[in-house]
Amino acid sequence: MTAGTVTVEQAARSLVARAQEVAVCLDFDGTLSPVVDDPQAARPLEGIVELLEPLARRFAAVAIISGRPAPYLAEHLGASGVRYLGLYGLQEVHQGQISVDPRLEAARPTVAAATAALADSLAVRESGAWLEDKIYSVAVHTRRVPDRDQWADPVDRTARQIAAEQRLELIPGKMVWELRPAVPSDKGDGVRRVVAESGARAVVVVGDDLGDLPAFAAVSQLVTEGHHGLRVAVRSEEAPPDLLAAADLVLDGPEGVLEFLRRLAA
């Protein structure tokens, strides 16, 4: 499919008709939750949570795949039957059990050193950027920084320098830079795992940021292997043009996602 080739009605009708074969993979921030200045204050849009359990019963699998820690996702969404893949698929909460890739455990001292270096850096201290310590990774947020456009380049350079010094991978996003262990994994790996483990023959991915592009790429690859796939982008003022261009369907903000999920659950 190419960008904008399907309507909400067509997509929902097709997915519901083959629900037991479909894996539904959803991002959190900017998709299920409105983007807010304080990442810790992010909450799912009202009406989202009540839909997740009915969707999990109807579809082959429902998974939340995010850069957030998996326990955070499970705590704030709390729907049973849903898989919560955090840290880009390297951590999971499923049926109340937490699993973590052992390579993340081994890298915890390195992440701690990077967190300390960021906290002590001139760019972070003077800008007022907020550090989100995820234990297995660390993120620098500038969304609530005064004159954040002025500080974007200094914070970017600092994050890249410290990532290189600690041999960590840098993942940029919308006003956020995440430093994490260079363990090969992205949202696309999470999508492929959910599809393989659920036996799904079709998959829909919904996301709003650069980190969702690998998930879109996974859908494209699965289609070449004989699966059906749908790539859904969530539009906002900050949505990456590449993501919108790669989408089969574009929804307007978490409100659009809510309406789409309501159609899938109806």
Predicted regions and their residues:
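Mg2+-dependent phosphoryl-transfer enzymes with acidic/Ser/Thr/Gly-rich catalytic loops
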Residues: 2-7, 19, 188-266
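The start of beta-strands in P-loop NTPase/AAA+ ATPase cores
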Residues: 22-24, 81-82, 203
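Conserved Rossmann-like nucleotide-cofactor binding loop
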Residues: 31, 70, 211
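Glycine-rich phosphate-binding "P-loop"
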Residues: 32-42, 174-183
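Short, structured coil segments at secondary-structure junctions
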Residues: 77-80, 166, 227, 245-247
